[in-house]
Amino acid sequence: MRPSQKQITPEQLAFAQAHALVRIVDDQADLREALSFVLDMEGWKTISYGRAEDFFTGDSPSEPGCVVLDVRMPGMSGIEAQHEMRSRGIALPIIFLTGHGDVDMAVGAVQDGAFDFLLKPVDNERFLNLSLIHISE
């Protein structure tokens, strides 16, 4: 069964929403706010960071959930943040965001453990489905 076809029970959804945190790491404030709004309206807990460095200093990776991570940001890139997460033993699922359809980069990120890749502008329904799937795993 493909991840997009995974069935989630209402009980699994309620448990995930009560215990999981979606971390949004993107340098675009308007996108962070929009993604947080979409998730908040569906009952998810979110926290946003404008830089990967802020994520590493401000987050508690022991709290379950996932990371929505922009590929290209000033300072530490999303790909560099993925490698840093791995070196620190942070095993949260990653959904990458990019405004650039770089297939080689996407393949490399998935091979390094990313769970999915979304192109900007983000399709809200696909974003919600991917978040639910990866948080519930």
Residue ranges and their predicted role:
Residues Q28-I47:
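Two-component/phosphorelay signaling modules centered on CheY-like receiver
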Residues D102-D104, L118-S131:
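C-terminal output helix
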Residues I133-E137:
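Conserved small/polar residues in nucleotide/adenosyl-binding loops
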Residues M1-R23, A29, S36:
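Non-catalytic signal-transmission and effector/linker regions of two-component phosphorelay proteins
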Residues M73:
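Receiver (REC) domain active-site loop signature in two-component systems and cognate sites
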Residues G50-R51, M76-E80:
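Acidic catalytic/metal-coordinating carboxylates
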Residues S62-V68:
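Active-site beta3 strand of CheY-like receiver
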